């Protein structure tokens, strides 16, 4: 649905911290977005996490979910950016390794003024590898 160039028009993140390659689905009415990240051995974080046993840091999986959410939510807040206010109930169920394809599935649960509450899950091969609930504050860049 949206390629990397369209994603980069909507959120400020750039390499090496842009963690979404493609938006697969965006349902603004249901407030659901699905994104994709192809994890390669060339990712900067694999240099130190962990040498000889590369595993994607769990916090970066959560960041990828947040970036997907930003693509959808920020259309309603031009010129602003979402910042984490809280991360709750984060669970990491399986390691993510080079060669995996992450599928982010995020849903907005509530928007109140400049606060957004959401929940998300990330999958590799239909298995949940991470999940969390988030609160964002929408603020000036």
UniProtKB/Swiss-Prot annotation:
Subcellular location: Cytoplasm
UniProt entry keywords in alphabetical sequence: Cytoplasm, Lipid A biosynthesis, Lipid biosynthesis, Lipid metabolism, Lyase
Enzyme Commission no: 4.2.1.59
InterPro entries noted in UniProt: FabA_FabZ, FabZ, HotDog_dom_sf
Gene3D superfamilies with a match to the protein in the record: Hotdog Thioesterase
Main location: cytoplasm
Catalytic activity: a (3R)-hydroxyacyl-[ACP] = a (2E)-enoyl-[ACP] + H2O
Molecular functions per Gene Ontology: (3R)-hydroxyacyl-[acyl-carrier-protein] dehydratase activity
Any single GO CC term annotated in Swiss-Prot or TrEMBL for this entry: cytoplasm
Class in the EC hierarchy, top level: lyase
Active site positions: 49
GO biological process: fatty acid biosynthetic process; lipid A biosynthetic process
Similarity remark: Belongs to the thioester dehydratase family. FabZ subfamily.
Function: Involved in unsaturated fatty acids biosynthesis. Catalyzes the dehydration of short chain beta-hydroxyacyl-ACPs and long chain saturated and unsaturated beta-hydroxyacyl-ACPs.
Protein name listed in UniProt: 3-hydroxyacyl-[acyl-carrier-protein] dehydratase FabZ
Natural source organism: Fusobacterium nucleatum subsp. nucleatum (strain ATCC 25586 / DSM 15643 / BCRC 10681 / CIP 101130 / JCM 8532 / KCTC 2640 / LMG 13131 / VPI 4355)
The organism's taxonomic lineage, starting at the top: Bacteria, Fusobacteriati, Fusobacteriota, Fusobacteriia, Fusobacteriales
Gene encoding the protein: fabZ
């Amino acid at each position: 649905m949206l390629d990397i160039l369209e994603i980069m028009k909507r959120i400020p993140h750039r390499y090496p911290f842009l963690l979404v390659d493609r938006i697969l689905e965006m349902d603004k009415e249901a407030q659901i977005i699905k994104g994709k990240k192809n994890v390669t051995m060339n990712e900067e974080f694999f240099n130190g996490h962990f040498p000889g046993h590369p595993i994607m840091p769990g916090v970066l999986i959560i960041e990828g979910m947040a970036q997907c959410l930003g693509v959808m939510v920020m259309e309603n807040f031009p010129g602003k950016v979402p910042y984490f206010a809280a991360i709750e109930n984060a669970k990491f169920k399986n390691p993510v390794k080079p060669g995996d394809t992450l599928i982010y599935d995020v849903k907005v649960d509530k928007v109140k003024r400049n606060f957004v509450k959401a929940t998300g899950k990330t999958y590799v091969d239909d298995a949940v590898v991470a999940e969390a609930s988030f609160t964002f504050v929408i603020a000036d860049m």
